[in-house]
Design a protein with these regions (language model features):
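Short glycine/threonine-rich catalytic loop with a Thr-x-Gly-x-Asp
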Residues: 219-220
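Mg2+-dependent endonuclease catalytic cores in nucleic-acid-processing enzymes, primarily RNase H-like
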Residues: 1-20, 30-34, 51, 55, ...
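Short amphipathic C-terminal alpha-helix that caps PH/PH-like domains
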Residues: 124, 227-230
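Acidic two-metal-ion nuclease catalytic site recognized across multiple nuclease folds
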Residues: 229-249
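ATPase catalytic-site recognition across NTP-hydrolyzing enzymes
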Residues: 15-83
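A cross-taxa feature marking solvent-exposed loop/turn segments within ectodomains of secreted
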Residues: 88-91, 131, 237
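Gly/Thr-rich phosphate-binding beta-strand-loop-beta motif of the actin/hexokinase/Hsp70
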Residues: 73-100, 226
């Protein structure tokens, strides 16, 4: 017999219960908040969000990510970003904004949007201007080169300082994501959950990052790909240190 299956997560994108009914029946937001607090991320997704994940193949574990509550005092050494652009379809455009302090990179903001190209491009411009990003790298695969050109032109027209460069990647995406993950885990800091409670976009990006698996297919790999680009870009900007020493002879 033919059947129609309806899949509905316990909570919506804003963390509000999808099963909170009148007259005291159903499950309210507090109930699901308590459940999430007492379960690991994989169990929560599988049991309540209809998003089963292959636990053994996860590349990023939310518990092992470095977190922060506020930026260090003082001016950052640099503000950079990298953008995994989107064309048409269901892919997401992802652009983390990193504040560098010494050897650490604080993920202060992130765009994770699958809206129309026009809306996304406008948001990219606004984000680069807001954070006064000095250098940004856009992928030039597919339509990325044209998007980078349009965003750069608009940033300059509005008095921005961002210098956008492009890079075409020939490496296998999954291999690149895996190889760059140690740098992300060691050097990148993400906002604490208490800070992003009402930041739907940041939470969505974290969920996609920690949902990436090496053991099967991924519905969305845009976020881990963007952080791979960030890691590669950050390392490319590190200049060699020259030390003066006494000639031994």
């Amino acid at each position: 017999p033919r059947a129609k299956f309806i899949v509905m997560p316990a909570v919506d994108e804003n963390g509000e219960s999808n099963f909170d009914y009148k007259y005291g029946v159903g499950f309210d937001k507090k109930y699901f908040d308590d459940m999430k607090e007492n379960l690991d991320d994989c169990s929560w997704r599988a049991l309540f969000m209809n998003q089963p994940i292959e636990r053994e193949g996860l590349l990023y574990n939310e518990d092992e990510l470095r977190r922060y509550f506020e930026l260090p005092s003082g001016t950052p050494d640099a503000v950079i970003s990298a953008c995994d652009t989107k064309d048409k379809g269901k892919d997401f455009c992802v652009m983390p904004v990193l504040y560098q302090y010494g050897n650490d990179y604080y993920v202060e903001d992130i765009i994770c949007d699958n809206s129309s190209p026009e809306i996304v491009e406008s948001r990219l411009v606004s984000c680069l201007l807001k954070h006064k990003v000095k250098a940004s790298r856009f992928e030039s695969n597919s339509a990325g080169g044209k998007i980078a050109e349009k965003v750069q032109r608009e940033v300059r027209a509005q008095g921005g300082i961002t210098n956008i460069t492009t890079k075409y990647s020939t490496a296998n995406k999954d291999t690149r994501i895996i190889v760059d993950s140690p740098f992300v885990k060691e050097r990148f800091l993400f906002k604490d959950d208490s800070i992003i409670k009402n930041n739907q976009e940041y939470r969505r990006a974290l969920g996609m990052l920690c949902g990436y698996t090496m053991a099967g297919k991924n519905a969305h790999d845009d976020v881990p790909d963007a952080f791979s680009m960030c890691a590669d870009f950050a390392q490319s900007l590190v200049t060699a240190q020259v030390k003066v020493f006494t000639r031994p002879f």
